[in-house]
Amino acid sequence: MRYLALCTDYDGTLATDGRVLPETESALERLLASGRRLVLVTGRELDDLQKVCPRLDLFEYVVAENGALLYQPSTDEETPLAPPPPEAFVTLLRQRGVGPISVGRVIVATWEPHESTVLATIRDLGLELQVIFNKGAVMILPAGVNKATGLASALEKMELSPHNAVGIGDAENDHALLALCECSAAVANALPTLKGAADLVTAGDHGAGVVELIEELLRDDLASLEPRLERHNVLLGTDDQGNEIHIRPHGETLLVVGADGAGKSELATGLMEKLAAASYSFCVIDVEGDYGTVAKAVSLGSPSRPPTANEILKLLRGAGQSAVVNLSGLPASDRRPFLMDLTPKLAELRARSGRPHWVVVDETHDLLPANEASGELLPLGDGESVLHITERPNLVTREVLRATSLFIALGASAQTLLDEFCQVSGLERPVTRFAPPKKGEALAWRPASPNARPVRLNIAAPQHGRAAAGAASGVGKTGIERPARARTGPLH
C-alpha cells in the first residue's frame, strides 16, 4: 500500500456549511478500516472546531490554526508549533477598529477588508508575521508557519513520510498542504488556482469530493493516477537527442549490470543522491562495504562489526532517514541468512510506514543467485521500488529478471549483456543502433514497454564518488523537489 494517510482540509472540503455529512463520515470510517490513517488540517481554532465537528476521534492528529497547533484527539494533547501572538499586536488591531477578531493559541484571525490595517500594524510594530488569506478570512501567523509545516510535524509523529500521504483541499491556504503530499486533490468547488496545481480534481464538491477520493484509494490505491504524477519522477540522465530519462519513485525495479569498473556504483550513488534530495528514503544492502559515504545516509556495520536488524529498523523509522547496511563484517555464508531475517522485517516496516521507499541490493548475484529459489528473499512488496546491481544477468535469480522494469547495462560489453538478459528472460532482443557506451554512458531499455528501443543514457555525475569502506555520512532532510520538466525521452 503506497498511500497510508489522507490529509484533508475541513471547511469547503470535508465539511459543507461547517458540518460533515453522514455519508462523508461513513467514508472516513471505511478508509480507517482499510488500515489507512487520517489527519485533519484546518485554519480553524481548536475550540471552534470541537464545537462543529464531534467526530475528531476519527483523526489521529488535527493540525489546527493553519499549521500552528497540533492536537491529538486520542490523548487530548495540544502542542503549539509556534509562539503566541504579541499582546501589543492584538491590542493595537482592536484600537484601530479591526473586528471581528479572534485569537487562538498562535493564530490571530479577522476578515476582509481589514487586511490593509493588519499589514500596516505589522509594519508599525516591526513584527515578523505573515498574512494568509482563505476565502475572505485574514489569518495572521508567525513567518514560515502554514499547513505544510504543521502537517509535516504530525506525519513525523506518526512515523510517516509525506511521500505516502494524499492531501485534499479547496482554498488559498491549501496550496502548501497539497504541495507537501505525494498526491494532491482539489474538490470541484476549489479555487481555479488550486485545481490547476492539483494532481486530481474530483467531480464532486465538498464532502462528496472527499468520498470520491476515498473510493479511489480503496479501489486501487490511486494506481490509475500514477501517469499524472510526473512531478515526482527522478532524473537519470539524457539520451543522445537531449531528452531527459526518468524513473518513477514508486513501483520500479531496476537491474544495473556491468563488469567491475564499468561504473555501476557511480550510477547507483547518483540515483541515491537524487532520491535523498527529494526526501525519499532508501536501504542499501551493501555486501562489500562500498557505499558508506552516500550522501544523507547512515552506514551501519563495518568490516569488524556486522549490523543488527534492530538498529537498521530503528534508523529507518525516523523521518528522512536512509541506511547503508554494511555486510562486509559477515562471513559470506551468513549473508543470505541475515537477509532472510531482515527482509520480512523491512516488508513489515514498509507496510506500516511506507519506508524505506527504495531497497538497493549490491552484488545481487551473491544474495539472490540464479541457481537457488529466492522468492522469500526478494525485498519486494506490492509495487515497491528496488535497485539490483550485479555483473551479469545470468548470475541472478529469474524472479529479479521477471520483475525488471528498467534494464541498464554499462561498459563495452553492454550489448552482449542485453542479449544475455533477453535470452535468460525469454524476451525478443530489441534492435540497437549505436556504438557500445563509453564511460559515463549506459545502455537503457524498458522491456515491458511496447515498441521501446534501447537508448544510450548519458549519466549525470554524482556529487560523491565511490565510497570508502566503513565511513558514515551526515543525515539531513530537504524539501520535495518539483523541478520544471524538460523534454521526456522514450524511457520515461
Please give the residue ranges for each predicted region.
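Active-site phosphate-binding/coordination module
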Residues: D17-V103
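Walker B catalytic acidic pair
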Residues: Y10, V287, D362-T364
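Conserved ATP-driven motor cores of ASCE-family P-loop NTPases powering translocation/secretion/packaging/pilus
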Residues: S385, R392-S449
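Short, well-ordered beta-strand core segments
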Residues: L31, V62, S184-A186, V201, ...
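Mg2+-dependent phosphoryl-transfer enzymes with acidic/Ser/Thr/Gly-rich catalytic loops
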Residues: M1-Y3, L21, L141, A148-E230
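Conserved P-loop NTPase motor module
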Residues: L235, Q241, E441-H492
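P-loop NTPase catalytic phosphate-binding loop
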Residues: E230-W358, L368-L387, E391-L395, E399-A403, ...
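Conserved acidic, metal-coordinating active-site core of Asp-based
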Residues: P86-L180
